[in-house]
Amino acid sequence: MKILFIGGTGLISSACSELALASGHELYILNRSLSTKYPLPAGAILLKGDIHADEAHLASLLADQHFDMVVDWIAYTVEDVERDIRLFSGRINQFVFISSASAYQKPPKYYLITEETPLENPFWKYSRDKITCENRLMQEYHDHKFPVTIIRPSLTYGPSQIPLIGASWAHPYAVVDRMKRGEKVIVPGDGTSLWVLTWNADFARGLAGLLGNEKAIGEAFQITSDEVLSWDQIFLETYQALGV
């Protein structure tokens, strides 16, 4: 299959890029080619451009291309998805929007979160923007059969990111350093609340099952692990892995 990843060299998407290539797909990656943590994987075809800056340039890059699937890893606002609708309507078989599990109801009325849980987060604009994006894409699906699939990742980690709430995005190993020095660390709540972590390569396998799947069109999915841990357990597992 011929696949376009918009982004494609981030924490989650890099694992998906590697798996797509290993599975024999023809993978195009559209980005600015600036990532140092996750460079362009061998075998991928680079379309160099800034998806948020120059739509005319993007249209020329994509003018003669037809993709089986497009996955936009870096659409955050309704303006982003409006652009994607303009660029790809009638030219693709499937459009995958990467949303977020943070879009689910906050505070939740029930501890078990499913795809049917209402989308409502008054505490974080990022999440509200993702909800608006989802609603716009589903409207386009119902009105014009735009072939959208929505995916809601939860807390995903990989080689460059420690899966701990409170870890700095810029300096993710700061919490590990405190553990190694015997310093106190901040654990969410009283440590007993439950959470699910997802290794980025596991997410990639979940995505692979949805790409090219006609039954996924017009649907939303969350891709997470099936292992439920308390935050105390998560921090303890991290501490024990350090061998200190």
Predicted segments with their positions:
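Conserved beta-loop-beta element that borders a ligand/cofactor-binding pocket
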Residues: 136-165
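Active-site "gating" loop of Rossmann-like NAD(P)-dependent oxidoreductase/epimerase domains
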Residues: 100-125, 139-143, 167
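Glycine-rich "substrate-gating" loop/helix at the edge of Rossmann-like oxidoreductase active sites
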Residues: 158-169, 189-201, 225-227
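Mid/C-terminal beta-alpha module of Rossmann-like enzyme folds, strongest
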Residues: 209-244
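A conserved pocket-lining segment of Rossmann-fold NAD(P)-dependent short-chain dehydrogenase/reductase
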Residues: 174-198
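Active-site YXXXK catalytic motif of short-chain dehydrogenase/reductase
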Residues: 126-130
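NAD(P)H-binding glycine-rich loop region in Rossmannoid oxidoreductase-like domains
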Residues: 9, 34-91, 97, 103-105, ...
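N-terminal Rossmann NAD(P)H-binding glycine-rich loop of SDR-like oxidoreductase domains
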Residues: 3-23
